[in-house]
Structure formats: C-alpha cells, structure tokens
C-alpha cells in the first residue's frame, strides 16, 4: 500500500445530488476521494453518460467514472450505513486504497417529514439507523485512523443548526438530525478537552433548498418551485471553505452554506447558485440561530468517565 500525496476524503452518501457534487468538487480541488453509498452499478454500461445526477442511474460507480475521466483520483465502495461492519470496511478500504484518511464527509441520510402520529415506528427506526447511528459508527471507525495520523483530520456532517422551529411537523426526522448536531457539538468539546487542536468536526445545512433527488418530486408536481432552488455547488463550495479554515474556526460549528460563505469566504453575490437565472431562492432557515452556551459553560463540575469507572469494577 502506497500513501497518496494528495489529501484523502471519504464521502458517505456520494452517489447523487449533493454528495456527488461534493465528491466532484473536492476532486477538482486536489483531493483523492473514496465514494461510498448503497447504490452501485456497472458504470461502463450507463447510457447516456454522465447520467442525470439526481436520478437512480447515478451511483458511486458513475461518479467515480466522471471523476476519473476528468483526470481526478477516485475509488468507490458499496456501504449500507445501517451495518457497522460495512461502515468499517468502507473506512478500511479508503486507507487500503489511498494509504491514509484526512477528511470524512457524512452525507448519508433518510428523510420522512410527518407528524408523530403518521410516522410508523419502522420508518422512525430506519431514520435513526441511517442518520445518527450511521454517523456515530462512521465517526468511531474513522477516529482510529485520525489517531494514527497524529490526530489530524476534518469531519463535516450534514446536520442543522439547533433551533426549535426545526422540530415542527417532522419530529421523528428532527430527533435524528438534531442528534447528529449534538454529536458535532459534543465531539468538538472532546477534541478541545483532549487538546487535539488539529481535529475539527463541523455541521452544515442548506440555507435555501438545493436541487437534488429529494426535490425532484416537488419540481414535478409544481414547476414554479424551481425558482426556490440552488445548485448543489453552493454546498460543496462551503464545505471546501470549511476544510480550508483553521480548525479553531470550524470545530463545533453548526452553520448554513450561505452564511459560512458570506461570513468566512467573502462571498456577497449568490446569484450564480440559483437554478433559475435571476431568481432569488427563498431562505428556509432562520436569519439568526439561538446561542447554545450558558453563563456557566466552563463549569464541568466533577468529571465522570464511565469507561474508567467500569474498569475499576
């Protein structure tokens, strides 16, 4: 196994839409990318090529082919994030292929927006498995390799800033997604406590809806909604900005693509990101988010570690 000179990113959920765009744009910016998702195919037989990026024809294999044909460095691995063994294999395969791991982007997700009454337990469990549990298992699998890299690495999670309006009308979905954001905040605190200053974990969420497989149905039922969509490269541009920023700036940050680009990358004109030229997509996120810190933030009380307590038993 030889170590790739360029930085290496593992992208979970890279088969289409936002994940595909993130993979392509990281490759264009010098990353070797491992594309991981459940959907696979024989890319050599895909016609037309490249396929519609928001269709089921787009898989990790077609994205790999797109990147390779553009001169980039990519590989693909099948993974069902409900299976911890498959997650471990995807992480191990990344290091077997490229010799190291520098960045994890967790874009895998399941969505169901409805009331508690109309969300079956089976659907709820599926979202928990793919969203917070899949993220947790992936992060744990990656931490071993970040440790071998002298605790140098970046994690970017597709999860929202925390605010109460997000819960309305989609409680079951929000429980998982906000749980992912809690992991971002909590692991960031761990990195600080453990003095791992070259590590960071960041959450990112779209300020306006992004054209993806999830928005295709809405466009079909109401074509006028297209004016409220942005291209997925706003998301990949923001992620690239996060990866370039100092860890102290992004560790524990929960932000939107637009706000990060404006406040940290100097972007003032977002018109090029609109799917419909000249349109200004409606912002779906609040203008400001609540501050989660309290006055006694630094008071940890008496520290406890269940691992150490268990070892003494």
Which positions does each model-derived feature cover?
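Catalytic Tyr-X3-Lys loop
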Residues: 102, 110, 117-137, 156, ...
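Conserved mid-core segment of classical short-chain dehydrogenase/reductases
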Residues: 49-61, 110-125, 148, 169-172, ...
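The beta1-alpha1 cofactor-binding region of Rossmann-like NAD(H)/NADP(H)-dependent oxidoreductases
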Residues: 54-58, 78-90, 121
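Catalytic loop of short-chain dehydrogenase/reductase
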Residues: 147-195, 205-210, 215-216
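Conserved glycine-rich cofactor-binding loop
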Residues: 15-16
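Amphipathic alpha-helical dimer-interface segment in Rossmann-like NAD(P)H-dependent oxidoreductases
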Residues: 92, 96, 130-151, 188-193
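C-terminal helical subdomain
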Residues: 203-204, 220-311
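Conserved glycine-rich Rossmann-like NAD(P)H-binding loop of the short-chain dehydrogenase/reductase
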Residues: 29-62
């Amino acid at each position: 196994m030889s170590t790739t000179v360029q930085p290496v990113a593992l992208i979970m959920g890279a088969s289409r839409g936002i994940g595909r765009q993130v993979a392509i744009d990281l490759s264009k910016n010098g990353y070797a990318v491992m594309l991981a998702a459940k959907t696979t195919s024989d890319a050599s037989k895909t016609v037309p090529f490249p396929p519609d990026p928001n269709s089921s024809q787009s898989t990790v294999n077609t994205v790999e082919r797109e990147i390779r044909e553009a001169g980039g460095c990519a590989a693909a691995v099948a993974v069902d994030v409900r299976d911890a063994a498959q997650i471990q294999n995807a992480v191990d395969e990344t290091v077997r292929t490229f010799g190291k791991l520098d960045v994890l982007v967790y874009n895998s997700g399941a969505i169901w927006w409805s009331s508690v009454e109309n969300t079956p337990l089976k659907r709820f469990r599926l979202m928990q498995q793919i969203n917070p549990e899949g993220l947790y298992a992936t992060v744990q699998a990656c931490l071993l390799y970040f440790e071998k890299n002298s605790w140098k690495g970046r994690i970017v999670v597709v999860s929202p800033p925390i605010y109460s309006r997000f819960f309305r009308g989609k409680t079951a979905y929000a429980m998982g997604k906000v749980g992912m954001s809690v992991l971002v905040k909590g692991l960031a605190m761990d990195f600080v406590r453990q003095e791992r200053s070259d590590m960071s974990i960041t959450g990112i969420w779209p300020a306006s809806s992004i054209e993806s497989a999830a928005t295709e149905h809405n466009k079909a039922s109401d074509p006028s909604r297209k004016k409220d969509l942005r291209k997925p490269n706003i998301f990949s541009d923001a992620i690239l900005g996060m990866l370039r920023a100092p860890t102290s700036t992004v560790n524990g940050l929960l932000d939107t693509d637009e706000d990060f680009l404006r406040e940290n990358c100097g972007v003032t004109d977002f018109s090029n990101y609109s799917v419909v030229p000249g349109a200004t997509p409606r912002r779906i996120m609040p203008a400001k988010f609540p501050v989660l810190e309290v006055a006694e933030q630094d008071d940890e009380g008496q520290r406890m570690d269940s691992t150490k307590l268990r070892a003494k038993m």
